[in-house]
């Protein structure tokens, strides 16, 4: 590879590259894009196409439209299309071919259920990402084919105040998540209240919780009935040196009148007014003298004993207020969606009430308007009932609205409407589509597409070996029979339980006079603790610690098992169940996962860690990115992080330094890919009583006894090997995507999974460290 001449007057020694250190720590998006720009400017001219190791995707999820962005860019390059918003493809003109393998009927759940069986896929592709559940035509979505208008009066629905748009669409109301939760009949106010268990699940402030010790109760402890008064609440926050703090509160009574609208001056120094969201500026807040304690005192006076607070993501508002209230209706959970997703308030306001809020031409959100809107949404739900809401088919409305969102320019609209097929046609090329006879897709009947329909997956495989080398762009679709709803539900449950048990350790025995506070500090030093309980069923006390991340549990085992603690030689181990019997093997394979090979986990990091690390980054060669998760509620940085390095060797050297006598951190190699961590964080944790066995459904037991190729475990291994052989036959420089689209049916939806790489792509040095912070989860900006 020949070096590129430097544009500046300075020269570098042969074989050396100038390391650029950012003058300040920047946010994830800015760091990612500056990283891309610098890399493209400073890297030598490459003879091979390659993907950036940094992926940036909100919630670690890549939409079907974003996939289409990449595929169109891969065909025509930046002269015709903007770069993809979520990844970077360098030297696109050196790309040889594009091949997309689709495993229809499989999902992210299947991949991690049979993780050990998909050996080649997890090792060969270091770029992995989540996908939302598929629409009725997944292929049309990722290719960018324009769908025919199939949903009755959808445009009118989005304009009207009472949208009956979906009445012409055949939908199964029985399987609608709103019907499953509330039933068909109208419900009273008390049925819409979040239970204490739900409030715990969704991180509402509750009395007795350690993170709510300084929170103030509203003192509303009266008896709530269906006639209790509703109050809409919305708060705006800014970012201070201690995290997010309250800057405005709006409280609206049931009649629509605003009973409280106050600006609030935070106690700590403001570092970001978040004006685009809050509408608050330094000039607005300067004369304000009202403090948080004043607002708390007024709320306690204003709210009657049986007051019900209504809001959208109300947990965030209550945490900003540092108050505890027992009776809440959260409209983001009231209008329930599948897979734990939530509709935005702006969408619900338009779809349900026919009103526009949070308009882009207005500076920030209007807290009073938002509070009043949540109140109206709650009253609409109570007036019309769950059946009416389900009939609106909000998912279809949401999909339609997304597809109709305009781009900034006419050119943008034109690009949006261009499909991959049209891109290929413009350069005189055709797309190959291999599938089975039974598969129906708009793609198969499209012009400029060479469709070959086969009788079986085996025939698709045979045709792929012959046809792929003849086409610049190929889509190969294998179809698998979806699992039964019962089996899918059981698999989902077992995944949750297994991950909880893998992240849980039992430690002991301890002396009865041991220092419990010191023990808690010790085990918390390995990482964030979800739950810690004292086990007294044994002769001597033990501790049960459930960690938030798998790395923390593994680090505790490796550090303390067989060690003398508080005068006792303790054993630290996971619970032994049928789901953890292969835990050691799974942990080892996770560590070898291509996405984890160059990543390390560190615990005990302080808020100044990132600045300290950047000051000494010259000793951490190959450092590509930092992931610094923040607590969703407080906005404070958590006490752990992940560092991504170019090579395993660089990661190992850094780990030795950071866990040494100078830095004194605890750490190990990472185990959890970013997208997996985000997915698991979104699942409600499940646990079971010790000794309770999980019995596989009879259908799976029978299949296992038969040991034939149709068993899911064997099928996963079998087809993983087949795809491996196809991959090895691809020419170097081929962009290859493996897509497990997920499933969407009346029985429920499953998220998809994507794996991506360029065959024989050349590794490259990243000149700038990317700092990634997240208040919600570990962001999927690294792959």
UniProtKB/Swiss-Prot annotation:
Q: Which CDD domains match?
A: REX1_like (cd06145)
MF terms (GO), sorted A to Z:
exonuclease activity; RNA binding
Q: Which GO terms describe its biological process?
A: rRNA 3'-end processing
**Which residues does the UniProt record annotate as the domain Exonuclease?**
230-378
Q: Which domain of life is it from?
A: Eukaryota
A Pfam family per the record: RRM_1
- Recite the UniProt keywords alphabetically: Exonuclease, Hydrolase, Nuclease, Repeat, RNA-binding
Q: What is its EC number?
A: 3.1.-.-
Segments forming domain RRM: 503-577, 598-677
Using the UniProt record, name the top-level EC class of this enzyme in a single word: hydrolase
Q: One GO cellular component term, please give it.
A: nucleus
Q: What is this protein called?
A: RNA exonuclease 5
């Amino acid at each position: 590879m020949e070096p590129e001449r430097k544009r500046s007057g300075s020269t570098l020694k042969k074989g050396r590259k100038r390391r650029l250190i950012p003058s300040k720590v920047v946010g994830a998006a800015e760091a990612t894009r500056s990283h891309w720009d610098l890399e493209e400017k400073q890297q030598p001219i490459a003879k091979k196409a390659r993907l950036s190791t940094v992926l940036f995707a909100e919630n670690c999820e890549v939409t079907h439209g974003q996939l289409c962005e990449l595929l169109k860019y891969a065909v025509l390059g930046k002269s015709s299309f903007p770069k993809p918003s979520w990844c970077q493809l360098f030297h696109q003109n050196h790309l040889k071919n594009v091949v997309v393998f689709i495993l229809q009927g499989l999902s992210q759940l299947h991949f991690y259920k049979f993780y050990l069986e998909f050996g080649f896929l997890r090792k060969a592709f270091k770029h992995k990402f989540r996908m939302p559940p598929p629409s009725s035509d997944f292929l049309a979505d990722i290719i960018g084919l324009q769908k025919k208008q199939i949903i009755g009066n959808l445009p009118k629905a989005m304009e009207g105040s009472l949208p009956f748009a979906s009445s012409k669409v055949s939908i199964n109301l029985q399987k609608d998540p709103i019907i499953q939760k509330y039933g068909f009949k109208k419900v009273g106010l008390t049925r819409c209240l979040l239970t204490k268990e739900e409030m715990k699940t969704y991180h509402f402030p509750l009395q007795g919780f350690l993170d709510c010790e300084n929170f103030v109760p509203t003192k509303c402890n009266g008896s709530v009935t269906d006639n209790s008064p509703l109050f809409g609440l919305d708060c705006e926050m800014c970012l201070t040196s201690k995290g997010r703090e309250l800057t405005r509160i709006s409280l609206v009574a049931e009649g629509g009148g605003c009973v409280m609208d106050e600006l609030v001056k935070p106690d700590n120094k403001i570092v970001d007014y978040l004006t685009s969201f809050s509408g608050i500026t330094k000039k607005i807040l300067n004369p304000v003298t009202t403090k948080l304690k004043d607002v708390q005192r007024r709320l306690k006076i204003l709210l009657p004993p049986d007051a019900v607070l209504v809001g959208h993501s109300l947990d965030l508002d209550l945490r900003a207020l540092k108050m505890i209230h027992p009776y809440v209706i959260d409209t983001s959970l009231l209008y329930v969606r599948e897979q734990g997703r939530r509709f935005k308030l702006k969408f619900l306001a338009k779809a349900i009430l026919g009103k526009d809020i949070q308009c882009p031409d207005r500076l920030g959100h209007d807290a009073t308007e938002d509070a009043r809107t949540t109140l109206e949404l709650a009253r609409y739900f109570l007036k019309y009932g769950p059946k009416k809401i389900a009939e609106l088919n909000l998912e279809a409305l949401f999909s339609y609205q997304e597809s109709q969102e305009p781009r900034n320019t006419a050119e943008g609209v034109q690009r949006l409407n261009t499909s991959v097929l049209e891109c290929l046609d413009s350069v005189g090329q055709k797309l190959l589509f291999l599938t089975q006879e039974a598969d129906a897709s708009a793609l198969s009947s499209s012009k400029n597409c060479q469709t070959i329909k086969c009788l079986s997956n085996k025939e698709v495989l045979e045709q792929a070996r012959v046809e792929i080398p003849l086409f610049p762009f190929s889509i190969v679709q294998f179809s698998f029979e979806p699992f039964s709803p019962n089996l899918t539900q059981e698999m989902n449950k077992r995944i949750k339980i297994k991950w909880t048990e893998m992240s849980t350790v039992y430690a002991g025995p301890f002396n009865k006079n041991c220092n419990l506070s010191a023990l808690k500090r010790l085990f918390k030093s390995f990482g964030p603790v979800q739950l810690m309980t004292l086990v007294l069923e044994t002769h001597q006390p033990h501790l049960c610690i459930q960690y938030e991340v798998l790395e923390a549990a593994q680090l505790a085992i490796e550090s303390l098992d067989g060690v003398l603690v508080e005068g006792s030689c303790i054993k630290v181990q996971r619970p032994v169940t049928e789901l953890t019997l292969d835990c050691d093997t799974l942990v080892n394979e996770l560590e070898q996962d291509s996405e984890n090979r160059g990543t390390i986990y560190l615990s005990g990091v302080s808020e100044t860690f990132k600045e300290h690390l950047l000051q000494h980054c010259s000793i951490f060669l190959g450092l590509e990115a930092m992931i610094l998760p923040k607590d969703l509620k407080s906005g404070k940085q958590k006490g752990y992080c992940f560092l991504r390095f170019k090579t395993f060797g660089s990661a190992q050297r850094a780990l030795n330094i950071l866990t040494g006598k100078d830095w004194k951190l605890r750490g190990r190699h990472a185990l959890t890919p970013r997208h997996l961590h985000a997915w698991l964080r979104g699942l409600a944790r499940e646990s079971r009583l010790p000794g309770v066995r999980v019995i596989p459904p009879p259908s799976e037991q029978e299949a296992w006894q038969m040991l034939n190729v149709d068993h899911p475990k064997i099928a996963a291994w079998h087809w993983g090997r087949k795809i491996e052989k196809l991959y090895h036959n691809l020419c170097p420089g081929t962009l290859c995507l493996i897509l497990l689209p997920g499933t969407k049916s009346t029985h429920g939806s499953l998220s998809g999974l994507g794996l991506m790489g360029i065959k024989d792509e050349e590794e490259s040095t990243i000149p700038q460290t990317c700092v990634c912070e997240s208040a919600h989860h570990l962001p999927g900006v690294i792959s």
